[in-house]
Structures are given as C-alpha cells and as structure tokens.
C-alpha cells in the first residue's frame, strides 16, 4: 500500500517535480541523490490575481535575499560550525585515467548514481585518499536559464545550498567536502560525502513498514540533526524520507538543502512553503500571504516521516494535489487501533494541526517512546560550542573572566 501511494505521490508532483528522476536503479550503488528542487505548489494558485503575484514575488525575493545576506555575513566573519572548512577549488582539469575512466581533478568517475532537473550525481573515487564521493555536477548556463521563482534562477538555489552547507558539520547531516568552480568553464561541482547505505524508504513497504525499533533509531538521528539545524538558525524546508540517507552502519543523515532558508534573531517566519506537498504542514496550505513558523513546519514533516516509517503510508493523501492539501488542513488524523499508546501520543503531538500546540523537537527528544531503552537523545557538542568553550578556558587560564571589567 505504501509503495502504491509513494508512486502516486510522485505522479502528482510530490517527488518527481523536485528534480528527482522518479526512479531508481537498484543495481547501482546507493546514491546521495539530493539534486532536487521543489516547485511551489500553492493550493490557491489558480485564484491569485496579479497583485498577489507581485506581492509574492517581492516576498520570495526578500526571503532569499535575507538568507543570502545572513549566510554571507557568517561566512565572511568566520561564523561557521566546521572544524575543517569546505575546500574551494577554482581550477578544473577534466581528462581520463589510464583505464579510460573520466576524471575531474583528483577524482576518477565510477558511475552515475542519480539525476535531476538541475544536473546529475556521479560516484567518484579520489586518487589521493581512495575514498568514494558523490559529486553533484551542474552546467552554470543551465542553472541561470532555469527559473524556479519569479525572481530566482536555479543558480540561486544551488549557491544558497552551498553557503548553508559551508557553515554546517554534524554526524547526522551529509557533509560538503569541496566546491569546484572554474570561472573559465561552464561546469560547477559539489563534492559530497558518499552515503553508502540506503534511503529511509528502503524496506518501508508491505508487509510491515520499518517496525518500532528501527523507526525509533532513525527518528532519534533525524531529531538530533534537525535540532542542530534549528539551533544554527537553518530551516530545512523539505524533510522527507527521500532526503534522509542511511549509512551502512545505520546512521541517518539529512541531505538536500536546495530549498532551505536561514534566519536570525529567532525570526523563523516564512511564506510559501517550498517543500513536498504530502509533507507540508497545514498552516503552509492556507491562503498565500499568511506567514508560518519554519521550525514548526519542519517538525510537522518529521511527524509525517514517522507516520510513514511506522504505518507504511501517508497520513493525508488524495487523488489530486488540491484534495491532498484539503485533507491536510481539514481531515482528522487516523491512527489504527492497537498502536503503542506512547507512539500514538508522539504521532498525535507531531501532527497537531495547530502549530502553537504542536510538539517541539525538544519535546520529541524527551518523549518516553523516543527515549525507550536508549535513554535521552544526546545533545551534540558541535564545533562552534567547542570552539567557544576552548576560548573561555583559554581566557580563564590567562586570568581573564567573562565578567571581568576591562576598565
């Protein structure tokens, strides 16, 4: 049932229009195929007038510009949470090795592992460290021609994704290793860590979804990674199993930041959700112009993902996109009888239609079902916290107190 609804979801635009190929070659290595982009599916799009379109264009431009300005400031001032900065390479050498395999600088092509409307994802092996990497390959001219919003091209999405990934480093987030952008060529590459396991979706079809044990393990990783993003003022915007990759050791990593936004001063208000329709929060399905909390919308998407992992189907899905949105907004949540009461409570809390009453990720991390036998979800002591702590310790060692008066 789940796989049937999954395939249907692709046909109505829930996955296919986001740059994914819509199919997977099961014989190929499992890719980190996050070369996706979402089309804005507004349930009132047919009723919008020119004035509303202009207002949305201004808002879209303002939101994206705000994110880019914040990111540029953080990068320019070294406000990043990475122990090792992303390498930036401005020279591209394309060729072949002695076996006739194509090469990009130090990387030797192995096979194509994904494709999308923006470009393709190819598995490469580094001749320097012998490791495998997933490289997203783009043509800059194509990105500049491809319009994704009234005032934005696909190049804006890709550059914003790069900037976001440059400031982040976490074990539950796909890591950006290098960016190759030679101004003398039309090629642009993102070198990412290769996740050699599977998608969260794999194995989630009949006859029994994932089961509580696996779903709990995956959820803990998802919550840990997303809490880190929110703590660093990043809204993912498209949390769904397709963007959650599982390593061979079972660790979940969040990928695809192509529609993500950043905020500051605790102001996470957004308009026009860019995410996948069946994972869209009710407040994002309402008449355009209404703002919503990006963090609360991300949390709803976590709830839909958990529902999928546990029950093997979507909580709200209809025959058309319009009807799907109507169900998300108006239909009651249906949870089968006999489900673990603690799990039922968690799903109901995550999929609360009122965002002000919806569970926060902190609530989720402390929920009895999530704690289970594994204990509380550990707080990740990230690089910027470690760096700040070391500076405080260094200051104390030098006799400088945070509260000391320099005068």
Swiss-Prot record:
Changing residue 260 to D: Abolishes activity. It catalyses: L-seryl-[protein] + ATP = O-phospho-L-seryl-[protein] + ADP + H(+); L-threonyl-[protein] + ATP = O-phospho-L-threonyl-[protein] + ADP + H(+). GO terms for molecular function: ATP binding; kinase activity; protein kinase activity; protein serine kinase activity; protein serine/threonine kinase activity. SMART domains: S_TKc (SM00220). ATP binds at residues 113-121, 136. The keyword NADP does not apply. Residues 31-40 have a biased composition (Basic and acidic residues). Expressed in shoot apical meristem, leaf primordium and emerging petiole (at protein level). It comes from the Eukaryota. One of its GO terms (biological process) is response to virus. Pfam families: Pkinase. PROSITE patterns: PROTEIN_KINASE_ATP (PS00107), PROTEIN_KINASE_DOM (PS50011), PROTEIN_KINASE_ST (PS00108). InterPro entries: Kinase-like_dom_sf (IPR011009), Prot_kinase_dom (IPR000719), Protein_kinase_ATP_BS (IPR017441), Ser/Thr_kinase_AS (IPR008271). Residues 21-64 are annotated as: Disordered. Its EC number is 2.7.11.1. Associates with the SNF1-related protein kinase (SnRK) complex. Interacts with AL1, a geminivirus (TGMV) protein essential for viral replication. Activates SnRK1.1/KIN10 and SnRK1.2/KIN11 by phosphorylation of their activation-loop 'Thr-198' and 'Thr-176', respectively. Required for the regulation by SnRK1 kinases of the transcription of a large set of genes, the modification the activity of metabolic enzymes, and the control of various nutrient-responsive cellular developmental processes. PANTHER family: MAP/MICROTUBULE AFFINITY-REGULATING KINASE, SERINE_THREONINE-PROTEIN KINASE GRIK1-RELATED. Belongs to the protein kinase superfamily. Ser/Thr protein kinase family. This is Serine/threonine-protein kinase GRIK2. The gene is GRIK2.
């Amino acid at each position: 049932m789940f796989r049937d609804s999954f395939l249907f979801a692709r046909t109505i635009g829930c996955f296919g229009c986001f740059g994914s190929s819509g199919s997977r070659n099961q014989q190929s290595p499992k890719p980190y195929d996050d070369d996706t982009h979402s089309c804005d599916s507004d349930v009132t799009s047919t009723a919008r007038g020119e004035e509303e379109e202009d207002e949305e264009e201004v808002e879209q431009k303002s939101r994206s510009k705000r994110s880019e300005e914040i990111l540029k400031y953080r990068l320019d001032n070294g406000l990043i949470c990475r122990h090792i900065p992303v390498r930036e390479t401005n020279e591209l050498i394309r060729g072949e090795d002695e076996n006739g395999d194509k090469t990009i600088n130090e990387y030797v092509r192995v096979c194509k592992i994904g494709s999308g409307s923006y470009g393709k994802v190819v598995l490469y092996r580094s001749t320097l460290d012998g490791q495998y990497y997933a490289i997203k390959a783009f043509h800059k001219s194509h990105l500049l021609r491809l319009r994704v919003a009234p005032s934005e091209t696909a190049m804006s999405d890709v550059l914003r994704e790069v900037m976001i990934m440059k400031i982040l480093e976490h074990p539950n987030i796909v890591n950006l290793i290098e960016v190759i952008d030679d101004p003398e060529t039309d090629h642009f590459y993102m070198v990412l860590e290769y996740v050699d396991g599977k998608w969260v979706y794999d194995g989630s079809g009949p006859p029994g979804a994932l089961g509580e044990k696996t779903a709990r393990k995956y959820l803990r990783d998802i919550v840990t990674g997303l809490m880190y993003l929110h703590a660093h003022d990043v809204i993912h915007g498209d949390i769904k199993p397709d963007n959650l990759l599982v390593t061979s050791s079972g660790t979940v990593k969040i990928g695809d930041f192509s529609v993500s936004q950043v905020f500051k001063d605790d102001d996470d208000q957004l308009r026009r959700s860019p995410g996948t329709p069946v994972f869209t929060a009710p407040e994002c399905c309402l008449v355009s112009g209404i703002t919503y909390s990006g963090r609360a919308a991300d949390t709803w998407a976590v709830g839909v993902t958990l529902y999928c992992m546990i029950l093997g189907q979507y909580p709200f899905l209809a025959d058309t996109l319009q009807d799907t949105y109507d169900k998300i907004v108006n239909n009651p949540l249906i949870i089968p009888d006999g489900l673990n009461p603690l799990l039922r409570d968690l799903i109901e809390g995550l999929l609360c239609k009122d965002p002000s009453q919806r569970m926060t990720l902190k609530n989720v991390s402390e929920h009895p079902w999530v704690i289970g036998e594994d204990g509380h979800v550990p707080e990740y002591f990230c690089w910027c916290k470690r760096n700040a702590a070391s500076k405080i310790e260094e200051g104390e060692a030098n006799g400088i107190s945070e509260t000391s008066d320099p005068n």
